[in-house]
Curated annotation (Swiss-Prot):
A biological-process GO annotation: proteasome-mediated ubiquitin-dependent protein catabolic process
All copies of domain BTB, residue ranges: 52-119
Pfam family, one: BACK
Kelch repeat locations: 295-341, 343-403, 404-454, 456-506, 552-599
Sorted UniProt keywords: Kelch repeat, Repeat
Record SUPFAM superfamilies: Kelch motif, POZ domain
Protein name as it appears in the record: Kelch repeat and BTB domain-containing protein 3
Residue ranges occupied by any BACK domain in the UniProt entry: 154-254
A GO MF label: ubiquitin-like ligase-substrate adaptor activity
UniProt GO cellular component terms: Cul3-RING ubiquitin ligase complex; cytoplasm
Classification via InterPro entries: BACK, BTB-kelch_protein, BTB/POZ_dom, BTB/POZ_KBTBD3, KBTBD3_BACK, Kelch-typ_b-propeller, Kelch_1, SKP1/BTB/POZ_sf
Amino acid sequence: MELAMDNSYAFNQRSTCNGIPSEKKNNFLVSEDHGQKILSVLQNFREQNVFYDFKIIMKDEIIPCHRCVLAACSDFFRAMFEVNMKERDDGSVTITNLSSKAVKAFLDYAYTGKTKITDDNVEMFFQLSSFLQVSFLSKACSDFLIKSINLVNCLQLLSISDSYGSTSLFDHALHFVQHHFSLLFKSSDFLEMNFGVLQKCLESDELNVPEEEMVLKVVLSWTKHNLESRQKYLPHLIEKVRLHQLSEETLQDCLFNEESLLKSTNCFDIIMDAIKCVQGSGGLFPDARPSTTEKYIFIHKTEENGENQYTFCYNIKSDSWKILPQSHLIDLPGSSLSSYGEKIFLTGGCKGKCCRTVRLHIAESYHDATDQTWCYCPVKNDFFLVSTMKTPRTMHTSVMALDRLFVIGGKTRGSRDIKSLLDVESYNPLSKEWISVSPLPRGIYYPEASTCQNVIYVLGSEVEITDAFNPSLDCFFKYNATTDQWSELVAEFGQFFHATLIKAVPVNCTLYICDLSTYKVYSFCPDTCVWKGEGSFECAGFNAGAIGIEDKIYILGGDYAPDEITDEVQVYHSNRSEWEEVSPMPRALTEFYCQVIQFNKYRDPWFSNLCA
């Protein structure tokens, strides 16, 4: 058949009027329901059994259809028709792993763009959308199942999502199982969990168990459930148990009760090594799962006379304070305190009779800085010397990153006019060794350091003393602990800050600063190097303490005037930008040490007799 156009009038010829050419006109036509009309026509073809060009062969039925519809809806069929496959030329494909009901349901969706997902058919749709690679339908099934996750079906959905490759459903189901782990691990479905999924469960920090011992019991129970086929996995699963967080007694019992299984799977030596680790370095591992620990804010203050000490702790969960027994911590003027695992480290300071108050301490004519490092073990209430730093220092800061203690800035032994130290050192608590790392880009005074993942941010001033004492916050450094590289950031604060009146804290891997002079909180965006205002708190004393825990910032104590010191504690909830007051400290304090520390519940020395 040949179609021809009558060219008696040339539509593209520009007409003239009185010698003046008229403008050429055009209209752009858009039919908004064009796609739906095409689908309706194709569905009519299907109902009338016309223009079919392909067949799906089932075990008990042959279903005719149109290639264009299959290819438009399914990546499986599109790939089949694009490449030189036998089915393309034969005009048919045989499918054996889907039922006729499933294929017809898929075709109904493909021709109409509509279907109804229910509890009864969602698994069928999930299976066919996975096999036929219908992404929109697969996501709809995944979203439907995510909303239905509960204690009864979560393990089944975890298995289904793993089989069908639904990352979103798998992540949601995995999170649910991890959160309710202690309620699920005794079920028969749990014992049927495949190795890969169990491994994923166990490696998470968020695994909700009352103690790490439960994780070890789960691994042994799962292995014994089908010992012949599963014992090969035991070494891999044992690695996911944080054995160094267990008590020596628990590990010894495991050796005694499971000796045969452990030896046959080459796991006996793993437990033996863990026992040696606990004996030599117990409490020096910061990787305890949050659900197995109690978290505290540790407060310590030595008065100017060097004799009166105040030490107490705040239990995050119970909002209660406890006055701690005398620890006799040697916190020299200008020293720095950091927590690591279940231990507290004190570095440096001045051995002479320097003033403890910062503004008076910096004015001393001579600083007899020390290189000593002390470790305090609250579990044993023991305070002892460890390896000395390479360089004596005072008025520095210390912070933990990559399981090492870093000491940054400050001044070494000498007269008041010596410059700030550029040398930076790191200490490995397990090997008990100090090493030098890359130096600071330039000198910094009043350093504040915070760690966000493996990056240390350091803020401070480039000058030590100004006429008004309060030097400006004009130094901002970034240290990548993984690559041992420093970089200097542009301090785009948007306003003036005093270096001695800000506190830097990390919250959920984000750096925040609290300005104690304006009562405002700012967060830092590492991509743009810009500080964003996050809100204001009611008030805060100068020289207050500030701590970041999970999604919260705690601001504690401080002074409004030399004779007006406060015991107030305020909490900023970063996830909802709200402030609240919590229980006040047992005593009003200013210029004190403030750190977060956590203990395994089974050896928590501060848990009992908490009092406000």
